[in-house]
């Protein structure tokens, strides 16, 4: 876990991944600031192997908050390249999380009427979205493709598509937010994942893009609406076929049992894919970390937010794990 390894032709100094944060330290146009670079550099300096940025909007219409990081325009490239160089100077690798807010934004923030799979309003600070049409779908796919190109151009080691956090792709995947009756509707898992898979496939088909693709998602809220273990198997199969390289499932606690089985979500996914996994969910003690070590196919371990609050926690954890492994 704390030793160097190689994956996808990339050399990582260890398997620890610093969690993405929603610091919103970019300027009002989404451009990287000096404060943002200092924030991420301080985390990388602790010794983690990989940094993952907060969600970066792939299009202005997909911006979810003021100060959110952007990767939608050429003007974002210079700052992003400075961020990448600063992190790599500290010895860590870095990925960027690509997102589109969908209905979870407002006209004040994104500059237009929010767009989502169906009409929806997330509450007082948001606006009622309009339903995306075929033209919107084509544009959204291109936004993600161009963002992937920019990420590779400035030197990011991988991208992560955000399929969680109740953002656009999660909205499509959830029957709570998606009540369409067309090919992108909620009737089947394939339909609910159609936009996601089209985005990933389009990135894969782009000859100028060879960057590894991680996919971030959560299913526990869907389980309340009838999502089953069979649905999970179908989800993994569809995502693999589209071109996902890494699965990053999120759970409130990484070892919580899933589908009334004896296994956690991470374990179930590991049994049904050959792709490497990211272990994420309340890993904030040596005991939990050692427990997760026994799960097959885990490539990265996301340290909990304690890493942000206690500057020396990484070295403390490293020593504790080493002591308990003796």
Residue ranges and their predicted role:
Residues 1-326:
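Flavin-dependent oxidoreductase catalytic cores
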């Amino acid at each position: 876990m704390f030793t160097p390894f190689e994956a996808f032709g990339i050399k990582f100094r260890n398997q620890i991944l610093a969690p993405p944060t929603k610091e919103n330290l970019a300027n009002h146009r989404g451009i990287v600031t000096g404060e943002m670079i200092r924030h991420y550099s301080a985390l990388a300096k602790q010794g983690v192997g990989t940094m993952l940025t907060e969600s970066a909007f792939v299009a202005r219409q997909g911006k979810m908050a003021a100060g959110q990081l952007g990767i939608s325009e050429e003007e974002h490239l210079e700052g992003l390249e400075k961020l990448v160089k600063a992190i790599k100077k500290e010895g860590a690798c870095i990925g960027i999380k690509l997102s589109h807010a969908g209905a979870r934004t407002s006209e004040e923030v994104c500059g237009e009427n929010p767009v989502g799979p169906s009409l929806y309003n997330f509450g007082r600070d948001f606006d009622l979205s309009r339903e995306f049409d075929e033209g919107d779908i084509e544009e959204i796919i291109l936004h993600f493709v161009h963002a992937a190109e920019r990420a590779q151009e400035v030197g990011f080691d991988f991208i992560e598509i955000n399929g969680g956090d109740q953002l656009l792709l999660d909205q499509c995947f959830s029957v709570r937010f998606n009540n369409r009756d067309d090919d992108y509707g909620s009737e089947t898992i394939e339909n609910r994942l159609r936009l996601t898979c089209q985005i990933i496939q389009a990135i894969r088909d782009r000859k100028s893009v060879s960057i590894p693709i991680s996919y971030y998602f959560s299913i526990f809220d869907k389980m309340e609406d009838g999502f089953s273990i069979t649905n999970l198997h179908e989800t993994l199969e569809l995502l693999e076929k589209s071109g996902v390289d890494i699965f990053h499932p999120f759970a409130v606690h990484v070892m919580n049992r899933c589908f009334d089985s004896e296994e956690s979500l991470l374990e179930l996914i590991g049994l049904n894919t050959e792709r490497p996994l990211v272990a994420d969910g309340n890993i904030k003690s040596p005991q939990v970390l050692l427990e997760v070590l026994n799960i097959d196919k885990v490539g990265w371990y996301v340290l909990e937010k304690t890493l942000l609050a206690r500057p020396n926690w990484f070295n403390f954890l490293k020593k504790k794990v080493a002591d308990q492994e003796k």
